[in-house]
Amino acid sequence: MSRIGKKPVQIPEKVEVSVKGDLISIKGPKGSLDRSLHPAVKLAIENGMVNVSVTDDQDRKTVALQGLFRSLVANMITGVSVGYEKKLLLNGIGYRAEVNGNTVVLNVGYSNPVNFELPKGISALVEKNTTLSLSGIDKEIVGETAARIRRIRPPEPYKGKGIMYSDERIIKKAGKAAAK
């Protein structure tokens, strides 16, 4: 049995969890999320807890699915109750970001500004022109959007210029040694 999968997930007060067939729906104050379940995974809702179990606990792949779906359900519950946020820093001379409706306009050293269309359910906020904050209820979409924006201009190892996560540390390389 999966150690993570065995732990039940606590359901907060303002969150509703329902299972219909192979679809789980979670509604909360921030919104609602749906996900289809694998045929080998079973969910049981008892006493304000969600228990994840599998049909065959001897097969390694289904045991791995138990831990996976337990984590996915926990992330969905956290998303609809609290939400997720990722911060990106723009480091470089003249690097800045601005939000126009559903588009983030990035000036990151290219000859033209880069227009990045935000996916549905993601909101962006710019603080001090160099900090971009992405928020939403789906952890996967927030993380994927942050990774796609970072990929536009990843930080380079010599000066650290580029787009980086707020908690990321760039290991800088030494430059060329001067000629003697």
Curated annotation (Swiss-Prot):
A single GO molecular function term of this UniProt record: structural constituent of ribosome
InterPro entries in the record: Ribosomal_uL6-like, Ribosomal_uL6-like_a/b-dom_sf, Ribosomal_uL6_a/b-dom, Ribosomal_uL6_bac-type, Ribosomal_uL6_CS
GO biological process, one term: cytoplasmic translation
Pfam short name (any one): Ribosomal_L6
GO cellular component terms given for this protein: cytosolic large ribosomal subunit
Keywords linked to the UniProt accession: Ribonucleoprotein, Ribosomal protein, RNA-binding, rRNA-binding
Keyword Cytoplasm part of the UniProt annotation: no
Function: This protein binds to the 23S rRNA, and is important in its secondary structure. It is located near the subunit interface in the base of the L7/L12 stalk, and near the tRNA binding site of the peptidyltransferase center.
Subunit-level organization: Part of the 50S ribosomal subunit.
HAMAP family per record: Ribosomal_uL6_B
NCBIfam families assigned: L6_bact
Homology family: Belongs to the universal ribosomal protein uL6 family.
Protein known as: Large ribosomal subunit protein uL6
Organism from which the protein derives: Desulforapulum autotrophicum (strain ATCC 43914 / DSM 3382 / VKM B-1955 / HRM2)
